[in-house]
Regions:
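Residues embedded in well-ordered secondary-structure elements
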Residues: 15, 101, 164-166
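Conserved SET/PR-domain catalytic core that frames the SAM/AdoMet-binding pocket
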Residues: 12-45, 132-156
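Catalytic cores of histone-lysine modification enzymes
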Residues: 30-122, 170-176
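Generic detector of ordered secondary-structure context
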Residues: 18, 24, 82, 104, ...
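Short, structured beta-strand/loop micro-motifs enriched in basic residues and often containing a Trp
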Residues: 7-17, 122-131
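C-terminal SET catalytic tail plus cysteine-rich post-SET Zn-binding segment of SAM-dependent SET-domain
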Residues: 114-181
């Protein structure tokens, strides 16, 4: 996104860590962000602390900038607190690749907060290393940019309520209703 105007800025949100807000009015269909992942792991590696101990320092630095809740959201112990925190950050901020057991994290896209009523949607590009974020409905300047953490593939049926609740368990969210534009 180097050659594009940034239409968002990152801010501290009072109740949910950091997030993105629009720097100007954004209209439906408009591109917000196109970004390459910086780390991809399969589901078994995403649970292996030794993988996080061996990460390249540049990747560790990028991962360390993502959200890390104080409560423990990882269901196993480790004696290495730094790697444990990186593991928690990966697990909290990862996005699944469609139809695969691989998950990835991004420097900026991973900062977009969840909403049961999203105003942007995300999709993987064909190369499966790049994701785009586009506007679902008009977003006013200063309004938070939010997405649903449930992948809504245009070819798939909308998940049933109990499926949506299970999908959101890792983040401890409960959506009582969903609105998709």
């Amino acid at each position: 996104m180097d050659d594009m105007e940034e239409v968002y800025r990152m801010v501290e949100m009072s109740d949910k860590g950091r997030g993105l807000v629009a720097t100007r009015t954004l209209n439906a269909g408009e591109l917000v962000l196109s970004e390459k992942m910086f780390l991809k792991l399969d589901s078994s590696s995403a649970k292996d602390v030794s993988v996080f101990q061996r990460l390249h320092p540049e990747i560790k630095e990028k991962l360390s900038k993502l959200s890390c809740p104080t409560e423990d959201m990882v269901d196993f112990d480790t004696s290495d607190p730094d790697s444990h925190c990186l593991l928690k950050k990966f697990r909290l901020n990862r996005i699944s690749l469609p139809g695969k057991s691989d998950t990835a994290v991004f420097e900026t896209i991973s900062m977009i907060n969840h909403s049961c009523i999203p105003n942007v949607f995300w999709f993987w590009m064909e190369d499966e290393t790049t994701m785009e974020i586009r506007v679902l409905k008009k977003i006013e300047e200063g309004e938070e940019i939010v997405t649903t953490y449930i992948h809504l593939d245009s070819g798939a049926e909308f998940p049933l309520r109990h499926q949506r609740m299970r999908m959101l368990l890792p983040w401890k969210f409960v959506c009582r209703s969903f609105v998709i534009y």
